[in-house]
Amino acid sequence: MVNFCGKEFSSRLLIGSALYESPAIMQDAIRAAGAEIVTVSLRRETAGGKAGDVFWSLIRELGVTVLPNTAGCRTVREAVTTARLARELFGTSWIKLEVIGDNDTLQPDVVGLVEAATELVNDGFEVFPYCTEDLSVAMRLVDAGCKVVMPWAAPIGSARGITNRDALRLLRDRLPDITLVVDAGLGAPSHAAAALELGFDAVLLNTAIAKAADSVAMAGAFKLAVEAGRIAYESGLMDARDFASPSTPVIGTPFWHAVS
């Protein structure tokens, strides 16, 4: 089980609801992933009136916990306003907070992120901040009152996997009581497994599943990878070595093998 802001969930795979070929494929992929938390963009929900109502109905049919996000926001004021609108629309105080600082890399504006997180926490929100892997930023978010921190593995949609393993490991070591979720940059099930092997509590995916040739099958693959990664972490992974270490015992080795 994994705890998000006082609520227990069995799935460690959070999934996004954008970019799918069709609404039906989105539903089937979310089910195949076994996801219990689904991120939803306020802009997607409110765009198009009736179309937004249909989309929201499809999400409700899944019986999942909705995590609204502030995707596309580039200023503190825009993000805070979007979060408040999302709370009213979706009836939840949970918000995945994004404040984008660069259009090319979609890197978070970490200064604005901390400012927005502080304001939203003070306004009663449970903030899930999307950030870089920088420890000092994560610690400021925790100091602001965030119970969850969501560092990227790599830029959004890049599918590069974990590019700074040491930094992510440091986050886990220094923030043992904080729920940590790798968010963005994962492109393959093996990337998700690697994040869980580092001790991260969960991963959040969208593009890697939505843009797969078979989104439903890929969702199932990620589900298995996340489960395998967590089991591996809990089982205790052996330490990496610089040199070989024989796994075959020398006791009982024929005597002529010892003759030089």
UniProtKB/Swiss-Prot annotation:
<dbReference type="InterPro" id="IPR008867">
    <property type="entry name" value="ThiG"/>
</dbReference>
<comment type="similarity">
    <text>Belongs to the ThiG family.</text>
</comment>
<comment type="function">
    <text>Catalyzes the rearrangement of 1-deoxy-D-xylulose 5-phosphate (DXP) to produce the thiazole phosphate moiety of thiamine. Sulfur is provided by the thiocarboxylate moiety of the carrier protein ThiS. In vitro, sulfur can be provided by H(2)S.</text>
</comment>
<keyword id="KW-0784">Thiamine biosynthesis</keyword>
<dbReference type="InterPro" id="IPR013785">
    <property type="entry name" value="Aldolase_TIM"/>
</dbReference>
<keyword id="KW-0963">Cytoplasm</keyword>
<comment type="pathway">
    <text>Cofactor biosynthesis; thiamine diphosphate biosynthesis.</text>
</comment>
<dbReference type="GO" id="GO:0009229">
    <property type="term" value="P:thiamine diphosphate biosynthetic process"/>
</dbReference>
<dbReference type="GO" id="GO:1990107">
    <property type="term" value="F:thiazole synthase activity"/>
</dbReference>
<keyword id="KW-0808">Transferase</keyword>
<feature type="binding site">
    <location>
        <position position="157"/>
    </location>
    <ligand>
        <name>1-deoxy-D-xylulose 5-phosphate</name>
    </ligand>
</feature>
<protein>
    <recommendedName>
        <fullName>Thiazole synthase</fullName>
        <ecNumber>2.8.1.10</ecNumber>
    </recommendedName>
</protein>
<feature type="active site" description="Schiff-base intermediate with DXP">
    <location>
        <position position="96"/>
    </location>
</feature>
<feature type="binding site">
    <location>
        <begin position="206"/>
        <end position="207"/>
    </location>
    <ligand>
        <name>1-deoxy-D-xylulose 5-phosphate</name>
    </ligand>
</feature>
<keyword id="KW-0704">Schiff base</keyword>
<dbReference type="GO" id="GO:0005737">
    <property type="term" value="C:cytoplasm"/>
</dbReference>
<dbReference type="InterPro" id="IPR033983">
    <property type="entry name" value="Thiazole_synthase_ThiG"/>
</dbReference>
<dbReference type="Pfam" id="PF05690">
    <property type="entry name" value="ThiG"/>
</dbReference>
<comment type="subunit">
    <text>Homotetramer. Forms heterodimers with either ThiH or ThiS.</text>
</comment>
<feature type="binding site">
    <location>
        <begin position="184"/>
        <end position="185"/>
    </location>
    <ligand>
        <name>1-deoxy-D-xylulose 5-phosphate</name>
    </ligand>
</feature>
